[in-house]
């Protein structure tokens, strides 16, 4: 895990400061360093009073896997308690707790937001939001054994315990603001279109944007900035002279 903590000048009194927190999730084959190495997130947030938590879940799709690594439980239950001991001035308020992620992490951010109701705002950038149209027994992403290790045997994704529709129906209080973006040239674009429609049918608060773009870091950094501008924090986009 990596943590970005705001500059001391942003925290006037550590004893009574209720600092907002953003959980920022990596994609497949990434880790807790990915956002730090591939984007300018540290510079972008240098003048913002915000704690950023970057956990590492390997390629576990932020689930409690079939092979015993309980990544979902770790982030949903254990990590907030651990962070509160290390950073006692980190907020415990839902309205100041946020989550976002790219690709696999986009799925993770939506799953965690819908199931825990811990986050007031959740974002997905090029998220792997649905596998309804993919044959996990025969695909070009990973071997069937990989998917079985994550999700087990699945006959119908939309009714499985791991679909976002199931999470929304069973657990969500529908108060979380969901912010979803995907590039129109991204291989996950159609999955995003499908999932957004399903979530909207269930009455969730979804803001969906799409624009020309591929499955690449340039777009994810840009969309992170756009998402940050929607949050109730003191973030200001840095001045960029042409």
Regions found by a protein language model. Name each.
Residues 1-242:
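Non-catalytic cap/lid and distal C-terminal segments of serine-dependent acyl enzymes
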């Amino acid at each position: 895990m990596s943590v970005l903590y705001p500059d001391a000048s942003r925290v006037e009194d550590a004893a009574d400061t209720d600092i907002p927190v953003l959980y920022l999730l990596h994609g497949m084959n990434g880790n807790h360093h990915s956002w730090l190495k591939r984007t300018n997130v540290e510079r972008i947030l240098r003048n913002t009073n915000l704690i950023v938590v970057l956990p590492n879940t390997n390629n576990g799709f932020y689930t409690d896997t079939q092979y015993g690594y309980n990544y979902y439980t770790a982030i949903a239950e254990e990590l907030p308690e651990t962070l509160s001991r290390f950073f006692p001035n980190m907020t415990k308020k839902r309205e100041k707790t946020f989550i976002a992620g790219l690709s696999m992490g986009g799925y993770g951010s939506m799953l965690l937001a819908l199931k825990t109701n811990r986050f007031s705002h959740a974002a997905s950038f090029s998220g792997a939001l649905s596998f309804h149209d993919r044959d996990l027994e025969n695909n070009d992403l990973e071997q069937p054994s990989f998917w079985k290790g994550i999700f087990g045997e699945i006959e119908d994704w939309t009714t499985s315990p791991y679909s976002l529709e199931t999470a929304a129906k069973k657990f969500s209080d529908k108060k979380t603001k969901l912010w979803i973006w995907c590039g129109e040239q991204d291989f996950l674009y159609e999955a995003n279109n499908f999932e957004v429609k399903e979530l909207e049918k269930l009455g969730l608060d979804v803001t969906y944007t799409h624009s020309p773009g591929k499955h690449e870091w340039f777009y994810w950094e840009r969309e992170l900035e756009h998402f940050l501008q929607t949050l109730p924090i003191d973030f200001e986009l840095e001045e960029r002279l042409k």
